[in-house]
């Protein structure tokens, strides 16, 4: 550090430090300070005498147990003798016995709660059944999938068009069909309307003369991609449409029909 930044400070030896101004002070706890606080009294445990315990009786096999029961108790059930014997637990049979020993049918509530494992029709009744075509499924998810996809009765609930008599299964298909009646896509040049935006875009190219889809094999170009796809079949080596009379092959079905209508010249 440079000398110019050092500050010389004189030490005053006559000034003594004042220790009473320190922040922390040591506190000495004296035992005489606890005299003003009462100490809690802890109760002593009570010592029981030998007379408080009842003597233990040891029974051996030679001495039978004939302890008298309290008055009013039955030796079999432990309940009051005036109440009679307690009825035994219900068995697995479908009938119970009354006090006279004769069989009596069980109640309707008990019969409904008991599982009918021996009856196979009872297990079939627990399956999930379609309320439209009465088909049964073992799980609820299978029934929901059936209603969504495979139920013929559900498929008959179609959506009908308000402009014509056509019906559709889904609401989305109906909305796409309604566009053929409303024709929301209108050409600004000639006023012709279309149902789809891409149809309008292909129509506008007929006004502008734009043909962005060109053939890589020849110099022809097309305004629509579908026309280019049909043109590329003429360059294909495999021509799958063959004439039955002269065995001539064509790349498109329309060309084959045109060939047959013009008159096929059969070679003799």
Curated annotation (Swiss-Prot):
Segments crossing the lipid bilayer: none
Function: Transcriptional repressor that modulates both activator-dependent and basal transcription. Involved in the generation and migration of neural crest cells. Plays a role in mediating RAF1-induced transcriptional repression of the TJ protein, occludin (OCLN) and subsequent oncogenic transformation of epithelial cells. Represses BRCA2 expression by binding to its E2-box-containing silencer and recruiting CTBP1 and HDAC1 in breast cells. In epidermal keratinocytes, binds to the E-box in ITGA3 promoter and represses its transcription.
Record keywords, A-Z: Cytoplasm, Developmental protein, DNA-binding, Metal-binding, Nucleus, Repeat, Repressor, Transcription, Transcription regulation, Ubl conjugation, Zinc, Zinc-finger
One GO MF term: RNA polymerase II transcription regulatory region sequence-specific DNA binding
Modified how: Phosphorylated by GSK3B. Once phosphorylated, it becomes a target for ubiquitination. Ubiquitinated by the SCF(FBXO11) complex; ubiquitination requires previous GSK3B-mediated SNAI2 phosphorylation.
Quaternary structure, from the entry: Interacts (via SNAG domain) with LIMD1 (via LIM domains), WTIP (via LIM domains) and AJUBA (via LIM domains). Interacts (via zinc fingers) with KPNA2, KPNB1 and TNPO1. May interact (via zinc fingers) with IPO7.
Organism of this sequence: Rattus norvegicus (Rat)
One GO location term (cellular component): cytoplasm
SUPFAM superfamilies for this protein: beta-beta-alpha zinc fingers
UniProt similarity note: Belongs to the snail C2H2-type zinc-finger protein family.
The protein's name in its UniProt record: Zinc finger protein SNAI2
């Amino acid at each position: 550090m440079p000398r110019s930044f050092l500050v010389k400070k004189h030490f005053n030896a006559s000034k003594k430090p004042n220790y009473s101004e320190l922040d922390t002070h040591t506190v000495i706890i004296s035992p005489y300070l606890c005299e003003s606080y009462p100490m809690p009294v802890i109760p002593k445990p009570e010592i029981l005498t030998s007379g408080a315990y009842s003597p233990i009786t040891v029974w051996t096999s030679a001495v039978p147990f004939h302890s008298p029961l309290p008055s009013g108790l039955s030796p079999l059930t432990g309940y009051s003798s005036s109440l009679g014997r307690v009825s035994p637990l219900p068995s697995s049979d479908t009938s119970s016995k009354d006090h006279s020993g004769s069989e009596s049918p069980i109640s309707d509530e008990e019969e409904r709660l008991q599982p009918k494992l021996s009856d196979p029709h009872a297990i079939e009744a627990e399956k999930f059944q379609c309320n439209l075509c009465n088909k049964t499924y073992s799980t609820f998810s299978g029934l929901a999938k059936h209603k969504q996809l495979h139920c013929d009765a559900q498929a008959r609930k179609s959506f009908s068009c308000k402009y014509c008599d056509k019906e559709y299964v889904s609401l989305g298909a109906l909305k796409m069909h309604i566009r053929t009646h409303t024709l929301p896509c209108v050409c600004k040049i000639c006023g012709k309307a279309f149902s789809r935006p891409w149809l309008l875009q292909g129509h506008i190219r007929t006004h502008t003369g734009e043909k962005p889809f060109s053939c890589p094999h020849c110099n022809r170009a097309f305004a629509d991609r579908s026309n280019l796809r049909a043109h590329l079949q003429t360059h294909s080596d495999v021509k799958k449409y063959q004439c039955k009379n002269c065995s001539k092959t064509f790349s498109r079905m329309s060309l084959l029909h045109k060939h047959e209508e013009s008159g096929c010249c059969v070679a003799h």
